[in-house]
Design a protein with these regions (language model features):
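A membrane-interface helix-boundary motif in multi-pass transporters
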Residues: 113-116, 174-190, 377-401
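Glycine-rich segments within core transmembrane alpha-helices of 12-TM secondary carriers
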Residues: 151-176, 192, 360-372
Length: 420
């Protein structure tokens, strides 16, 4: 009966705008994760930036996940349709600009600007476009669902996000092998332009907009940042938790070089998708199993499992074991991710939970910012020069285990009595 009810809600419970928004999100994830899969290798080798390329990839990741804090004010002011159109227009320009850096026909332009300056500008332009997507799509899901359909609506949204993360790198592989790595960025630009056209043609502004008096202004955002960053108990936990994301981003920043140069498997994009496919398959049963465990223990177990996965990679040079290790990492991710937001909500002052939760994704941004230069150092030191590629993954494991210990220490000293 429950299954039949869910199928009926799936068939009749959502208006067209809900489906349009989610399809746009799926194709945007194709473009984002397709480019993400090759970006480190592309900047380091094709564009010729060396280890600095890894640092810039990290800077780009930081901007993509930090700027939505500010972008929400733009969405509130101009609405979802205009913001989405601007997002995909900027994405189209940004991805294409990044792709130009690797095209022989554009080298005169790139060199006239300065190779590093050009790439930094192109990446930041792309990140500005990326900052608009999440407030628009998540906001549309919120406005086009009700109490009966909201849970299923968000489930559909997150499933499509993960599906995009799983298929994007595979599409990138086909383009890289067929045309060249620089054309992966061109592909992302074309997909983004297609999303722009689809937005203008099919996306309707959902009802229930934010009243003018309740819209967030930049002044309000910066005031909230002062409050949140001034709360040591809250912000210190986010910094500690960023250790997980430092490990996670190595799947895109360091692993491609290892898979190609050490494992001698040229199609590194396939290995990058293991995490996403595993998450799709195991999230529901793992979440059910972890539901009765206290959030701090669920996160600790998840951190420990994810950290240990890198020791599997370090232990031997093996494609099957590397695949198993990344799946093991995804298991750790699935164990802790749902409980993170529950725990962070408990850390926030009771009367300011909404404000503080708006900054809960900062660990993703901090992790990317640190993971970029760390990746450049790991690849150069252990893989290119040191002849000890396993050492890269030992360092990642140490970061994870130290973060796990610090998380327990933080919980011991800062958890309020009676908290979960």
């Amino acid at each position: 009966m429950e299954l039949a009810s869910r199928i009926e809600r799936l068939r009749t419970g959502f208006i067209r705008t809900f489906w349009v928004a989610n399809i746009l999100e799926l194709f945007e994830r194709f473009a984002f994760y397709g480019s993400k899969a090759v970006l480190a290798v592309y900047l380091v080798e094709k564009v010729g930036l060396g280890p600095l390329g890894n640092t810039l990839v990290g800077l780009y990741g930081f901007a993509v996940f930090f700027l939505p804090i500010l972008a929400g004010t733009v969405v509130d002011r101009y609405g979802f349709k205009k913001s989405l159109a601007a997002c995909f227009f900027i994405f189209s320009l940004g991805y294409f600009a990044v792709g130009l850096a690797g095209l022989s026909q554009a080298q005169a332009l790139v060199d006239s600007v300065g190779r590093v300056q050009y790439v930094v500008g192109a990446l930041l332009l792309t990140a500005i476009g990326g900052s608009l997507i999440k407030p628009c799509i998540v906001g549309t899901v919120a406005r086009t669902t009700d109490a009966a359909t909201k849970s299923l609506g968000y489930s559909i949204y997150y499933t499509l996000v993960n599906l995009g993360g799983a298929l994007g790198p595979i599409l990138a592989l086909q383009v890289r092998e067929g045309l060249g790595i620089e054309y992966v960025l061109v592909m992302s630009a074309v997909v983004s332009f297609g999303n722009l056209v689809a937005t203008l043609m099919f996306f309707d502004e959902p009802g229930g907009g934010t009243p003018a008096g309740e819209r967030r202004t930049l002044g309000k955002v910066f005031a909230d940042m002062v409050v949140v960053f001034g709360n040591f108990r809250f912000i210190s936990f986010l910094v500690v938790f960023s250790g997980f994301w430092i490990m996670f981003w190595q799947i895109f920043y360091s692993l491609p070089f290892y898979v190609r140069d050490v494992l001698k498997f040229e199609r590194f994009e396939i290995i990058e998708t293991v995490d996403a496919w595993t998450i799709i398959l195991i999230t529901v049963p793992v979440t059910a199993l972890m539901k009765k465990i206290r959030p701090i223990m669920a996160m600790t177990l998840g951190f420990a499992v994810a950290s240990a996965s890198w020791l599997i990679v370090a232990s031997t040079v093996s494609i099957p074991l590397t695949v198993i290790a990344i799946a093991f990492f995804a298991l750790g991710e699935a164990m802790q991710a749902p409980r993170f937001y529950e725990y962070v909500a408990d850390l926030a002052p009771p009367d300011q939970v909404g404000t503080f939760m708006g900054f809960a994704f900062l660990p993703v941004a901090i992790g990317a910012l640190v993971a970029g230069p760390l990746s450049g150092w790991l690849v150069q030191t252990y893989l290119k020069e040191g002849g000890n590629p396993g050492g890269m993954w030992v360092v990642c494991a140490v970061i994870g285990f130290v973060s796990t210990a610090l998380m327990l220490v933080h919980d011991r000293f800062f958890r309020r009595r009676g908290d979960a």
